[in-house]
């Protein structure tokens, strides 16, 4: 007999994951804050160690959101990151640096699910609109 299992309540599971990410995992990933020197679009990250998250990733995925705050996920150490990408440590800077915690890297951005979560957690009308676009284009088809 072939049994097929169906996941019910996938949207609520997604919401629960975002809440757990915000309260359990994300606080452990924070490295520091910086000021980004120069145009963010001219930063050429080594895609195996550093990618965009949050607003810049949303802009790259949707071409809809012009970033005001920046989020970088990286496996690089602090000194290497600052030197390589011309960042200035600044506890009030607009750029947050988080530890990259996944292995598979495709492209210039964090996985769409993570970008969506970052936008939802950051809040605001602009981020909500971009999050909805990402949800409908990248997440909902896979739920």
Spans of model-derived segments:
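Hydrophobic alpha-helical interaction segments
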Residues: 80-143
